[in-house]
């Protein structure tokens, strides 16, 4: 039994929300920052339905959207923080809330949820390849340069098989 066996795919609404941090604070955080980049491009980099193979189709509770967790893993690598600190930043850091596209008062995931998602990416080649393709897409658009590109290279080293 794996982490997601009892969960259905959680989805984000394709319609924007006026109350999310990215809608209200993107300029404050910096549109050209790594956080601003993820706020603008995260939905194109990681689509929830692309991770559907990791989830049960028709029963169980709804999961945290995998697109949100994928962005959280990038933020964690970028900021070089532990799982516990990643959870705390998702809960309280304005930059992370903007990048994740969540409301200010949202606590989006548990530490164990982030850990299980990472484990599924490592275990499932298809999910790992999807993650890599998304990062290559961003690189091709010219969005991953300098420090941002080093984050991608760090992910590649972690997932070498």
What kind of feature is each model-predicted range?
Residues 18, 50-52, 113:
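Short acidic (Asp/Glu) and glycine-rich catalytic loops that position anionic groups and cofactors
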Residues 31-74, 78:
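Basic, short loop/linker segments at the boundary and entry of helix-turn-helix/winged-helix-like folds
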Residues 36, 40, 70, 74-77, ...:
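A broad, structural surface signal
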